[in-house]
Amino acid sequence: MVVRGDGALMSERLARTRPIETILSGPAASLVGAATLTKLHEAVVSDIGGTTTDIAVLEGGRPRLSPSGARVGGHRTLVEAVDMETVGLGGDSWARWRRDGTGLVLDLGPERALPLCRAATMFGAPILDALKASLAALRPTPEDGVFVMEAGETPKPFTDATGDRRTRAAVLRALVSGQMRRVAFTPTDALHVLGQHSAWHREAAMLGAALLARQRDGHGQAAVGSPEALAERVRTALVERSATTVLSAAFAADGATEAAAALAHPDVPFHTTLRAAMAGQRAAGVLTAGLGYPLVGLGAAAGAVYGDVAKTLNTEPVLP
């Protein structure tokens, strides 16, 4: 049997005859599995993977369906499928600093990177030696701890692979097209630093965190005081982004498109108000923001972050 895009089952024979019915079958299968494991009839389900987070609503024990059918590349297929919100946020989201005036802002994704801890497990000494060399340099650069790689090749430090302006432009184009892959610090590395994940090379994650921690703002001050503080900053950013994303998807599923759009655009004043409410900040005017259903967290990083995400959204976490 094969799961259809709407969460129902179909035979293998029918799937071969009408493969279009399997659009979004993977996420739909996750939702059906979540419903089976949790026995919940109503829930918001968020599945955090390496590249993306998929969010959908369970009602009556089944996934809520999209009224307009699945969309592929902006085109309506008219095929019944799960009403799902997908955002570029996951365990492999690229974490880096962005200069904002004289300060630094931590960005997560939407670009994906191979985590440093995993790259060191795969390729060994070349990764560790390059990270240590960058840490030994007197001055930090934004490219410290960033590598690029082609399929089947050992990653090279970004600065070594981009010797001149023309080569740099070519490498950046190759990263966008997928011909090359970025290796850099990610939330997966942060969880290794904090001892909440142990699948791969913790030393590489620690070195990457140290390189990010010593990046300088416009006043010449280090971004944070230690690798552990940097890792906690990244984990906190993942929690906040996940909470905002889940709440936005819940609003969208309920038809509250203006509220969903406000959360998707940080420059909208309402976004700031909701963020303050989610953070529990005191103010003269109080706004409560959260979920009316339990939050089911799926994916490798769910156990490390979704307890705090649910707390932020004033709901119960369920981690099957």
Over which residues does each language-model region extend?
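N-terminally biased helix-coil "hinge/interface" segments that flank
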Residues: 1-320
